[in-house]
């Protein structure tokens, strides 16, 4: 009986520590994009509900590839949805003709290169990978 309790405590401790392993996610825009976005605005941009920045310019969201740890973290923290909920959301939007999901890129380096070259792009990367080619507007 004591062995079961010890194993359960160890399991709970490991599960609790696993959430600490996630890194911060930085939402990034082009250096020449002076926009600010609220948490709600960020969510709406990545869900295809907000198509323009406050300055009237088109907002072009860019995702990391499906299943990446940073993308999962972003979806949970910024969009308040699991990856399966996001997948179902976009399947429904595409099927009904109401939108298409953001473009997907493979790496943080790819995201930052695109954002650095496109004033309308908004993406997210692991905060530890941010360089001076982009501007961080929010960290989750």
Q: Can you describe what each PLM-predicted range is?
A:
Residues 11-16:
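Repetitive helical segments and hydrophobic/amphipathic motifs
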Residues 24-140:
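Exported/periplasmic ABC-transporter solute-binding proteins
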Residues 1-9:
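Bacterial N-terminal signal peptides that target proteins for export
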Residues 17-23:
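Sec/Tat signal peptide C-region and signal peptidase I cleavage site
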């Amino acid at each position: 009986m004591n062995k079961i309790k010890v194993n359960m405590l160890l399991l709970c401790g490991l599960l609790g520590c696993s959430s600490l392993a996630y890194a911060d996610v930085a939402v990034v825009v082009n250096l020449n994009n002076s926009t600010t976005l609220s948490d709600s605005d960020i969510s709406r941009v990545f869900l295809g509900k907000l198509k323009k920045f406050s300055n009237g310019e088109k907002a072009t969201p860019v995702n990391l590839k499906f299943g990446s740890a940073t993308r999962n973290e972003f979806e949970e923290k910024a969009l308040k949805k699991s990856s399966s909920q996001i997948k179902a959301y976009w399947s429904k939007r595409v099927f009904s003709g109401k939108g298409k999901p953001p473009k997907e890129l493979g790496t943080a380096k790819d995201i930052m290169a695109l954002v650095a070259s496109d004033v309308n792009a908004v993406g997210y990367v692991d905060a530890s990978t941010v360089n001076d080619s982009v501007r961080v507007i929010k960290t989750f």
